[in-house]
Amino acid sequence: IYQGDVVYSPEFTFSTADGTLDEQLAAYQAPIYPDNYIAIADWNMRGQWNLANVHDPTVVLGEDGYYYMYQTDASYGNAHEGHGHFHARRSKNLIDWEYLGRTMKELPGWVVPKLNEIRQGMGLQPVATAAEISYGFWAPCVRKVRNGLYRMYYSITCPGLLNGEGTWSERAFIGMMENTNLSNNDGWVDKGYIVTNASDKGFEFNVTAGDWANCYYKWNAIDPSYIITPEGAHWLIYGSWHSGIVAMELNEVTGMPKQSLGIPWAEGNAPAEYGQLIATRQAGNRWQASEGPEIVYNPQTEYYYLFMAYDALETPYNTRVARSKSITGPYLGIDGANVTEGADMYPVVTHPYKFAKSEGWVGISHCAIFDDGNGNWYYASQGRLPESVDNAVMLGHVRSIRWTKDGWPLVMPERYGAVPQAAITEEELIGDWEHIDLSYVFGQQKESSTMTLTDDHKVSEGTWKDSSWSFDAENQILTVNGVDLYLQRETDWEAKPRTHTIVYASYTDNKTYWGKKSK
């Protein structure tokens, strides 16, 4: 674990002023740390990482007032290798992040024995412990259980094939650790095995090259998300690709499965105790590009929200959301489609994009959703620079969420930068905007175009040219061509020097829009 004092370079600063919100806004200074962090990507520069080298984050607000972030083992140039697993950092303001180091020293002792126990039951030869670097340590989820108790559910993928060439890949596990004090990064105590991949194919684990549709596993035991319902029930939501996302109830005291788990191979049906299907892109499809479920409950709307990552992580990654009144579904999209029975999930929440005067961002998904306890909600994920720059750069992104009148979460297009939220006036809306139709196109970085609002409430340029606009000052909503655009002040990360601007986000039944005011 990193024991030294946190070290921020001069770039990692921001400030606001005392006084009224208008005075604070006038004095606002934006964060100026670099998006392309290659110069500080090395392990010996970790004290300056801030949000560099973040992938698949999970965020929890600790009792000490810090936000703690944990993540997949991934970094530019694999800088983390040999330094433990599920690395952590913390922040008081969601902008300046202190590196804390690993939470897990080495591969848990239960993994290989549990793997061989399952292999023995399947009539397969035992395996030896492989080099630690060959295991995957992926996608943790950390939640507060109560004062003085936190749980981390984590994924470990095992190397190799089930029975040599021509057979399916080895299984994965979800395990769990507990901690009583998040500021003690050495305080995580491993509690062991939770669940593994479940199959409905018995011992039919042979596979031909490229035959993904005939996947041996039905449920994939990675990408856990953990929730405690208002009634006090504990649930684990997990899954990646394969047949979809499942919900498994947990014992609220131990955090272990509520039902005893039988053998993870069966014929005809996957064992029911391994989970109940809550989301699938296509019923019966055993290899579908969806993963990274994140489940939250909003007491104001009384809905459960299931966020998902779609497509491959390098560039096409995009985020979707559906909602339900019940933890086990059915989950419906904004278009009314039942994703529990099988449908593509809408709306699109994030998508590869590009504002002018920038390279833009891709791979923006596998998110964490969290709130500050005061009604303010946030979205965190990695973002990657496009391949034309360096797609291996993975920077942590934190964005604000606004909720629509109909109870859907809108993620703001610009990253959070603690901009004072002085009321937006109608006069500020007149002029040029960068407008993005963020509707889904596989792997395409959606670019902005100019939209001009005139002082006579007309649109003189852009997609909605010759339409009219109006402004609801009380609710801070700009309506253009009948579409409600939810406004917020955020940092203009593309400006040089960075400053503040006004942004918007919007959903219709089949469209997502992002935009920002041009300077």
Regions found by a protein language model. Name each.
Residues 4, 10-519:
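Carbohydrate-active catalytic/glycan-binding domains of CAZyme proteins
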